[in-house]
Amino acid sequence: MPRQLSAAAVLFASLAVILHDGSQMRAKAFPKTRDYSQPTAAATGQDIAKPVQQPANQAPHQTLAARLMDGHITFQTAATIKTPTTTPVTTKNTPTTSPIIYTLVTTQATSNNSHTAPPLTKVTVGPSLAPYSLPPTITPPAHTTGTSSSTVNHTTGNATQPSNQTTLPATLSIAPHKSTTGQKPVQPTHAPGTTAAAHNTTRTAAPASTVPGSTLAPQPSSIKTGIYQVLNGSRLCIKAEMGIQLIVQDKESVFSPRRYFNLDPNATQASGNCGTRNSNLLLNFQGGFVNLTFTKDEGSYYISEVGACLTVSDPETIYQGMKHAVVMFQTVVGHSFKCVSEQSLQLSAHLQLKTTNVQLQAFDFEDDHFGNVDECSSDYTIVLPVIGAIVVGLCLVGMGVYKIRLRCQSSGYQRI
């Protein structure tokens, strides 16, 4: 009986010692629930994973696994690192049909890192966890990945364990997801000097400015006389009083009908230039112009060149002509030339210029008045016949009177 009591006491003492030692080992193995925001790993890994700074809008998805090695527990962090895309698209992640399993071993993170490690998921390992049971699976929620230009390099290290240790790998099971990518339309790139889009442009060309044509008269009419002057500063250079008419013919035949255009002094502008030996008078009107060039030669001057242009509106036709090396209206320097009779000059086969009631002077002026008048010979040819006709008429009248008187005298002598 005493031996049985002593044996029972020894047995209870042994059980007490075994239970005491077991509770100490359990307390050492699981002292408390740790915050694994900075876990340490006892494994002798050769590769050190670089800490990755994740975007602020993404929550880390991590799983902790417990490794039992000779009574020591080594905690490893299995992290899922989402590599952002570098293309500007919006990606929506939904569950796919095939699971992807990553086995990552992350070694101890140093405290000298400048970035703040994101919080990790806490796992409490209790006595009820079986030695070879797998940790719970963390399934990341569906999220939307934004645009990012950074690239993350993953370094996965396989820890080398002693042969007498049993390793429980940390397994991260990512739930199947389906990736649906919606791309925004790419904007076209415009290269210099090229047009990316076709532009339908309707351009309306402005009508070309046309000079209103002149209206021709089928029959000649009285020509108005205008006064035209050209000044050299304040001094008078050219002064002309005359009427001008332009005559056009569509055909060179003498039987071709003529049409007439008279210059209106009120609608004509005079301009020109003055020189020591050459001066010109330019008369501009609606639908054309007339240009007269004066040349001074020793003690006389004359018109050496005549040009004209006329545009007809109905039908639209341009008549122009030029006469060079002519001597017209020649007179002495300081005198004015006067020609009342009509003078004609053929400028081209279809254009003729006619002047009437002309009195003009160029170069030397005294005050603003014409000098001594030199008349054209054509004026004399008109006056002489008139004078002759008058003389002849007077002679006829005298002879008639004389005959009448003779008859009267002869009749008186017969009565006596």
UniProtKB/Swiss-Prot annotation:
Ranges of biased composition (kind: Low complexity): 188-208
Family annotation (PROSITE patterns): LAMP_3 (PS51407)
Annotated compartments: Cell surface; Lysosome membrane; Cytoplasmic vesicle membrane; Early endosome membrane
Listed Polar residues bias regions: 142-170
UniProt topological domain (Lumenal) ranges: 28-381
InterPro entries registered for this protein in UniProt: Lamp2-like_luminal, Lysosome-assoc_membr_glycop
Residue ranges of the TM segments: 382-402
Signal sequence coordinates: 1-27
Region (Disordered): 135-217
Positions bearing carbohydrate: N200, N291
Biological processes annotated in GO: adaptive immune response; establishment of protein localization to organelle
Topology in the lipid bilayer: Single-pass type I membrane protein
Record topology, Cytoplasmic segments: 403-416
Cysteines paired by S-S bonds: C237-C274, C339-C376
Broad class of the protein's primary localization: other
GO cellular component term, pick one: lysosomal membrane
Superkingdom classification of source: Eukaryota
Keywords: Adaptive immunity, Cytoplasmic vesicle, Disulfide bond, Endosome, Glycoprotein, Immunity, Lysosome, Membrane, Signal, Transmembrane, Transmembrane helix
Gene3D superfamilies in UniProt: 2.40.160.110
Family note: Belongs to the LAMP family.
Subunit record text: Monomer. Interacts with FURIN.
Function: Lysosomal membrane glycoprotein which plays a role in the unfolded protein response (UPR) that contributes to protein degradation and cell survival during proteasomal dysfunction. Plays a role in the process of fusion of the lysosome with the autophagosome, thereby modulating the autophagic process. Promotes hepatocellular lipogenesis through activation of the PI3K/Akt pathway. May also play a role in dendritic cell function and in adaptive immunity.
Protein name: Lysosome-associated membrane glycoprotein 3
Source species taxonomy: Eukaryota, Metazoa, Chordata, Craniata, Vertebrata
Gene that encodes the chain: LAMP3
